């Protein structure tokens, strides 16, 4: 078997979500161990160890991942990743000019935010690409994918280059920078074109919860947009780097060129991404945000797409932040290029030669504006001035009117320019002297440097002037080692001067220690410098730097300071002793001889100096540490890794031998949480020589079990280490060892990429029939992991091919699932009876082969006589599988093999529906042509969705074609076959918002825009908020006031679903605001009753002339009454704000405040009493018949405690009498209490009572008589509907009427409930089916109410009440 390439292995392992984990650890390892005293190999080693821990996960080494070779990644891929990262870090360590620092910060911050989420999407996007088959969409998405892959590949390739190659690559004519700049152009291979095509065609807007194509395209547009943004930041990063590079080289012309490119790239991309304010054009991010908001607003998101909603919110936040970041940055640079107004005169008496000043040389000056974080380009160079006898001229220039600082640059002849100083806003004279002082201190010729220093100081040079990376003359002298200058500086300076840090936190003593200038270090210590000060990024002290460089003399001078802390830690917890490991034996010897040194000191990751010496494979250094009697050779890091573990991981054979020979060594120490020993690691990382040595050592336990009971033998099989296995067999190891999951070595070999190991283990007597914890034999695993060779080897050895695992699956099922035809043939040759054998999911081999599209396998099984109509537990069958995937040839083949064409899955979907839903027109046409086998007019009893009676396949097929937005199939059904009325396609297209289908049906098939059903297409589109469809229908003559079903209009539908934009469109197109619906409510009242605050506000504010804010419904209720009923304080405030009359009384003589008081809604009462201004009035309670007739709202019914109490009290009063009734009902799952409550609601509606007031109000005789009679008659009608004669015999309705009348007349209203419940309890023959019928009859009476003094609107309210109860 050939080894997988790194790319192939990475792809396989990424499917196990390991690749990203490794890459993330590799990316972070630089940051985590950035101050490590050695990088290169040591960081790679620690990264590998860290990844092994990640690989082990919660403690168990994942067998499948190891078998795939994923454990190699820490040493294969990590090396590539780290090399790339180190090259990148090396480049970034170059100093940035001040002008580029802020840009670099912005770019780094933004790249990390965008790239993090883009990398997370990368793997998923490949899956999306493979699954998109749509002819229109696939080419567009492919462009996004192709560009993204090219961008990633080029970006990573460039970043891995060394500095010179990196520069050459970036500056290639017509190279990657130019190509990436074209991403925002409409070129065919750009990103702009496909992204806007998707947006404009609305391909990323899902029509239904099952619109998988749209969800995939949505994923694509998000990935593409993030790539677009990444391209911008990548370009900014590269142009910033190039500008900085040439700034450091002194090529200011090149610097200006790239500085200008940097700004232009930003402005161009800013315009494309967030639009141009001048033209009001929306940018890409705005369009994408609109798409996200549209998708988020779809109601079906709650139906199983919660993770999608979470993703949408995440992306909305991300793109909003990116937009804010880009919009907030007006420019990357100052737009103005400074003019050079400098007048140069030599006024100082400083004679040449000094520093760079030599007679006959020519000097030029250029300036740059600096304003907060923005910088301009560097201006043109001044005319040259010849140097004649004098140096350090004075520059005079006008004060900048905008109060910007001016940076001054100097260049001699064609040499590298230097920054020589900064002119403050109110300064007009500048003496060019301070840079020469800095240069004098930097001069390696200390005598010349000192002489120049003295002359410049005497002429007023400033020792505090700041230059490169914030360094002063103190830093320069510390680096050059000029002790005379340093003596002068320390004599005249303040304490703060000698402790002044540069931009990275290096003080002069840091620089001296890093340069090995022991004398300067000694001088600075005596001057009182802080000897333990730390750098900013890595928190290194001067002692860290001296130790790393191996400067023994400097170390000794530092140690003479009484304040020195020899164990001071850096950012990652490394002490100077750790750094000394890199410095060598001499410096290490000097360290361990110091009093107070901790030779076993650990870093934050738990690494000791001895760990580092072994990882560095530097045994002389390790031996030096061993000379300390206190050294702990078995010290462990945070993962319980000893030095021996690292030697085994790295494959250092000689170091491993040295360690094993140490008397105190613990050869069997195990890591945590994986419990892996050095032997485990040597095998895991394929270091055979180390593993063989450890196997032969008497100190090593070769049967040691890691977490999950994985032994070295198991690992040797997983990694295919034949030589190691041979040695294990020689020493008599048990070859049937089992892991915690009962894997034997033979199981692992059967799953591995080393089939030859199966034969080797069989020759050693491995158990063929051993089972894992899931009941799988080696043969089971070989077939289910697709290992054909291993399976065939096992089959030759008289293995049991009928052995099922815990899922009832046999080797034949695994062979079928993975298309192992040769294995299936071998099994069926041995035993033909397994051809149709089912697993626990009722899957046969044929069904599994079909589900996985193994065509040859399917045909082979059918040719042998397999049952072609096999169905599993979900109803999946071969014909359904191939139809779903669009394989016409296999559909034809199965037709010819007499497959049942009407076979359906558990959702009632047959092959025809699958073809329709997935847009496979070829299969649809073929099916329609096979009339002798398939007839779409056949009644389908498997489905009932959207069909009130018996419907044919044709009905569901047309409905599906429209719902799933398959326009070509719709055209075929409607246009070609002429089925205009089946499933009302125009209505369905409007319901689901498929505008192109709507247009086709109206324009090409000339269907009426108002349809022929009670509900019009406009009704459906309005209710579901499909703006484009609503606008189109109206433009094409749809009647906006046409009746919808249930006596509503389109605007009513839109209002009840809170579709504000639809309401606005309808309002502008002639909707009748005075028209009342079946609830006797206008659109305005409907908005209030629907709690649609935004719509109510819009109607009041924008359509005031069309509405009457004080209008009343049939019960004389105003919007304020309704808002109180629904306890909507926000709505109440809105109505009061716009002047609604609070004094209006409803049909029961109640104001809104009365109702709030009756229902004890304290917040509303308080507001209406105290905060409603001029409309407030004193409330006077009136007693009498109005209380009895007051009709309460549904919310009050559900809130009532009185009814529940009365009902429960009554039921519990006679448990014995009701026992049989209750038991029977309970056994039949009948909601008796709910039924009684429903009847109670019915009766209270008839009596116009609502829930009974607690105070005993008596009613007038006439009203009480009428109400009692109405209640009794309706109660009798309901019971008579049961056609139960004993019911009529057992209930005395005259007595019922008498008791109800007495209760109402005396004001004891709550007794009505008891009277009716008592009557029901007296019916001993009432059965559960009677209760069910009772409920249905109660509901049916909503359409046949005839009671005294009950208005039509009251009946409608009553009907709505019953409807809501029924729904609940």
Curated annotation (Swiss-Prot):
Asked whether the UniProt record includes Secreted among its keywords, one would answer yes
Other comments on record = Is the main neurotoxin responsible for the human envenomation syndrome known as latrodectism that results from bites by Latrodectus species.
Q: Keywords on this record? A: ANK repeat, Cleavage on pair of basic residues, Disulfide bond, Exocytosis, G-protein coupled receptor impairing toxin, Membrane, Neurotoxin, Presynaptic neurotoxin, Repeat, Secreted, Target cell membrane, Target membrane, Toxin, Transmembrane
Listed Gene3D superfamilies: Ankyrin repeat-containing domain
Q: Which GO terms describe its molecular function?
A: toxin activity
Assembly, in brief, is: Homotetramer in membranes.
Please provide the record's free-text comment about the domains of this protein. The H8 helix is predicted to insert into membranes and form pores by assembling into tetramers. The helix is contained within a helical bundle domain that undergoes significant conformational changes during pore formation to allow exposure of the H8 transmembrane helix and transition of the toxin from a soluble monomer to a transmembrane tetramer.
A Pfam family reported for this protein in Swiss-Prot or TrEMBL? Ank_4
The free-text tissue note of the record is: Expressed in venom gland, cephalothorax, and abdomen tissues from both males and females.
What is the name attached to this protein's record? Alpha-latrotoxin-Lg1a
Its family remark reads: Belongs to the cationic peptide 01 (latrotoxin) family. 03 (alpha-latrotoxin) subfamily.
Q: Which residues form the propeptide?
A: 1178-1368
Q: Where are the ANK repeats?
A: 469-500, 504-533, 538-568, 572-601, 605-635, 639-669, 674-704, 708-737, 741-770, 774-803, 807-837, 841-870, 874-903, 907-936, 953-981, 982-1011, 1013-1042, 1046-1075, 1079-1109, 1115-1144
Q: Which organism is it from?
A: Latrodectus geometricus (Brown widow spider)
Residue ranges for the region (Furin-like endopeptidase recognition region) are: 1174-1177
Q: Where in the cell is it found?
A: Secreted; Target cell membrane
The yes or no answer to whether the keyword Secreted is present is yes
The cellular component terms of Gene Ontology attached to this UniProt record, alphabetical and capped at eight, are:
extracellular region; host cell presynaptic membrane; membrane; other organism cell membrane
What does this protein do, in the record's words? Presynaptic neurotoxin that causes massive release of neurotransmitters from vertebrate (but not invertebrate) nerve terminals and endocrine cells via a complex mechanism involving activation of receptor(s) and toxin insertion into the plasma membrane with subsequent pore formation. Binds to neurexin-1-alpha (NRXN1) in a calcium dependent manner, adhesion G protein-coupled receptor L1 (ADGRL1, also termed latrophilin-1 and calcium-independent receptor of latrotoxin (CIRL)), and receptor-type tyrosine-protein phosphatase S (PTPRS), also termed PTP sigma.
UniProt cross-references to InterPro entries, sorted A to Z: Ankyrin_rpt, Ankyrin_rpt-contain_sf
Q: Which GO terms describe its biological process?
A: exocytosis
Q: Where is this region: Helix H8 is the probable transmembrane region of the tetrameric pore inserted in the target cell membrane?
A: 217-236
Here the disulfide bonds are: 392-1044
């Amino acid at each position: 078997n050939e080894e997988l390439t790194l790319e192939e292995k990475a792809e396989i392992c990424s499917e196990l979500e390991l690749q990203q984990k490794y890459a993330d650890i590799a990316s972070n390892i630089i940051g985590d161990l950035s101050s490590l005293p050695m990088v290169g190999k040591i960081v790679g080693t620690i990264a590998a160890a860290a990844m092994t821990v990640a690989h082990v996960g919660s403690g168990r080494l994942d067998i499948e991942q190891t078998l795939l070779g994923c454990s190699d990644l820490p040493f294969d891929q990590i090396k590539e990743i780290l090399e790339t990262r180190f090259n990148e870090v090396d480049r970034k360590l170059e100093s940035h000019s001040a002008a580029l620092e802020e840009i670099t910060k912005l770019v780094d911050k933004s790249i990390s935010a965008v790239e993090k989420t883009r990398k997370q999407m990368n793997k998923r996007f490949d899956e999306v690409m493979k699954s998109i088959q749509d002819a229109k969409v696939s080419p567009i998405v492919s462009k996004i994918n192709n560009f993204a892959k090219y961008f990633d590949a080029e970006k990573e390739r460039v970043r891995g280059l060394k500095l010179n190659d990196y520069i050459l690559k970036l500056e290639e004519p017509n190279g990657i920078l130019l190509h990436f700049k074209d991403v925002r152009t409409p070129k065919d291979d750009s990103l702009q074109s496909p992204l806007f095509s998707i947006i404009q065609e609305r391909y990323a807007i899902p029509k239904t919860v099952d619109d998988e194509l749209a969800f995939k395209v949505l994923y694509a547009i998000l990935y593409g947009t993030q790539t677009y943004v990444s391209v911008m930041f990548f370009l900014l990063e590269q142009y910033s780097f190039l500008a900085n590079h040439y700034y450091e080289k002194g090529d200011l012309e090149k610097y200006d060129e790239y500085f200008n490119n940097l700004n232009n790239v930003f402005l161009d991309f800013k315009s494309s991404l967030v639009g141009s304010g001048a033209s009001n054009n929306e940018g890409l991010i705005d369009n994408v945000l609109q798409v996200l908001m549209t998708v988020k607003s779809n109601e079906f998101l709650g139906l199983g797409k919660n993770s999608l909603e979470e993703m949408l919110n995440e992306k909305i936040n991300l793109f909003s932040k990116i937009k804010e970041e880009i919009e907030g940055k007006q420019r990357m640079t100052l737009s103005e290029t400074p003019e050079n107004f400098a007048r140069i005169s030599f006024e100082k008496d400083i004679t040449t030669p000094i520093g760079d000043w030599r007679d006959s040389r020519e000097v030029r000056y250029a300036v740059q504006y600096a304003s907060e974080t923005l910088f301009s380009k560097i201006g043109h160079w001044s005319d040259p001035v010849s140097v004649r006898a004098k140096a350090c001229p004075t520059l005079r220039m006008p004060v900048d009117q905008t109060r910007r600082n001016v940076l001054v640059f100097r260049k001699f002849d064609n040499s590298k320019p230097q920054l020589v100083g900064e002119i403050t806003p109110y300064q007009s004279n500048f003496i060019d002297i301070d840079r020469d002082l800095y240069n004098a201190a930097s001069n390696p010729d200390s005598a010349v440097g000192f002489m120049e220093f003295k002359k410049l100081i005497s002429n007023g040079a400033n020792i505090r002037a700041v230059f490169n990376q914030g360094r002063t003359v103190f830093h320069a002298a510390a680096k050059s080692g000029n002790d005379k200058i340093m003596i002068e500086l320390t004599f005249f300076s303040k304490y703060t001067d000698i402790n002044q840090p540069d931009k990275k936190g290096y003080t002069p003593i840091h620089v001296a220690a890093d340069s090995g200038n022991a004398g300067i270090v000694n001088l600075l210590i005596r001057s009182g410098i802080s000897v333990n000060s730390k750098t900013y990024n890595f928190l290194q002290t001067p002692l860290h730097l001296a130790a790393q460089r191996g400067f023994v003399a400097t170390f000794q001078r530092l140690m003479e300071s009484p304040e020195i802390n020899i164990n001071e830690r850096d950012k990652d917890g490394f002490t100077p002793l750790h750094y000394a490991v890199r410095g060598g034996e001499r410096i290490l010897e000097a360290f361990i001889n110091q009093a107070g040194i901790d030779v076993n000191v650990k870093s934050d990751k738990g690494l000791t100096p001895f760990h580092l010496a072994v990882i560095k494979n530097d045994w002389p250094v390790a031996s030096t540490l061993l000379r300390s009697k206190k050294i702990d050779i078995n010290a462990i890091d945070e993962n319980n890794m000893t030095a021996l573990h690292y030697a085994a991981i790295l494959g250092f054979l000689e170091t491993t031998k040295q360690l094993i020979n140490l008397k105190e060594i613990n050869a069997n120490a195990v890591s945590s949480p994986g419990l892996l020993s050095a032997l485990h690691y040597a095998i895991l990382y394929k270091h055979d020589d180390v593993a063989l040595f450890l196997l032969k050592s008497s100190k090593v336990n070769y049967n040691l079990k890691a977490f999950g009971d994985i032994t070295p033998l198991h690992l040797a099989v997983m990694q295919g280490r034949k030589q190691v296995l041979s040695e294990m067999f020689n020493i008599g190891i048990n070859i049937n060892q089992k892991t915690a999951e009962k894997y034997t070595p033979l199981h692992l070999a059967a799953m591995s990429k080393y089939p030859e190991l199966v034969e080797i283990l069989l020759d050693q007597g491995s158990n063929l029939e051993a089972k894992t914890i899931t009941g799988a034999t080696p043969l089971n695993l070989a077939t289910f992991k697709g290992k054909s060779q291993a399976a065939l080897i096992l089959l030759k050895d008289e293995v049991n091919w009928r052995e099922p695992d815990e899922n009832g699956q046999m080797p034949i099922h695994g062979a079928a699932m993975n298309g192992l035809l040769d294995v299936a043939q071998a099994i069926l040759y041995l035993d033909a009876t397994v051809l149709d054998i089912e697993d626990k999911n009722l899957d046969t081999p044929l069904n599994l082969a079909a589900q996985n599209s193994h065509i040859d396998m399917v045909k082979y099984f059918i040719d042998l006589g397999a049952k072609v109509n096999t169905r599993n537990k979900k109803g999946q069958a071969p014909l359904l599988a191939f139809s779903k995937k669009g394989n016409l040839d296999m559909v034809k083949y199965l037709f010819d093999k007499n497959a049942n064409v009407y076979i359906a899955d558990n959702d009632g979907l047959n092959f025809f529906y699958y073809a329709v839903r997935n847009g496979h027109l070829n299969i649809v046409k073929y099916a329609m042509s096979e009339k002798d086998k398939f007839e779409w007019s056949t009644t389908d009893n498997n489905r009932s969705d959207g069909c009130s009676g018996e419907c044919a396949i044709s009905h569901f097929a047309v409905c599906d074609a429209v719902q799933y937005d398959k326009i070509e199939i719709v055209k075929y059904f409607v246009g070609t076959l002429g089925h205009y009325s089946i499933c009302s396609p125009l209505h369905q297209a409007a319901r689901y918002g498929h505008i192109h289908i709507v247009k086709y049906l109206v324009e090409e098939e000339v269907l009426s825009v108002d349809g022929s059903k009670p509900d019009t297409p406009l009704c459906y589109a309005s209710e579901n908020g499909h703006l484009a469809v609503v606008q189109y229908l109206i433009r094409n003559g749809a009647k906006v006031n046409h009746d919808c079903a249930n006596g509503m209009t389109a605007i009513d539908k839109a209002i009840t679903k809170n579709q504000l934009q639809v309401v606005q469109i309808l309002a502008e197109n002639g909707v009748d605001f005075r028209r009342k619906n079946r609830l006797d409510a206008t659109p305005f009242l409907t908005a209030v009753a629907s709690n649609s605050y935004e719509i109510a506000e819009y109607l009041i504010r924008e359509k005031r002339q069309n509405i009457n804010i004080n209008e009343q419904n049939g019960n004389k209720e105003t919007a304020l009454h309704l808002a109180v009923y629904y306890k909507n304080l926000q709505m109440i405030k809105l109505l009061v704000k716009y002047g609604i009359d609070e004094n209006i009384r409803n049909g029961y003589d109640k104001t809104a405040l009365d109702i709030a008081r009756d229902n004890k809604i304290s917040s509303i009462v308080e507001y209406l009493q105290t905060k409603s201004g001029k409309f407030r009035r004193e409330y006077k309670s009136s007693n009498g018949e109005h209380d009895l007739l007051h009709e309460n709202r549904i919310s009050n019914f559900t809130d009532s405690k009185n009814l529940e109490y009365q009902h429960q009290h009554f039921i519990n009063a006679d448990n014995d009498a009701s026992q049989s009734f209750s038991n029977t009902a309970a056994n039949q799952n009948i909601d008796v209490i709910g039924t009684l409550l429903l009847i109670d609601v019915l009766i209270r509606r008839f009596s116009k009572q609502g829930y009974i007031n607690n105070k005993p109000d008596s009613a007038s005789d006439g009203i009480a008589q009428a109400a009692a009679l109405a209640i009794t008659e309706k109660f009798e009608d309901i019971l008579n509907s049961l056609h139960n004669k004993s019911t009529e015999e057992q209930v005395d309705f005259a007595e019922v009427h008498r008791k109800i009348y007495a209760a109402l007349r005396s004001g004891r209203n709550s007794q009505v409930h008891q009277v009716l419940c008592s009557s029901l309890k007296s019916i001993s023959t009432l059965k559960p089916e009677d209760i069910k019928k009772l409920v249905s009859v109660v509901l049916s009476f909503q359409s046949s109410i005839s009671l005294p003094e009950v208005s039509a609107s009251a009946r409608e309210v009553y009907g709505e009440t019953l409807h809501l109860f029924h729904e609940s």
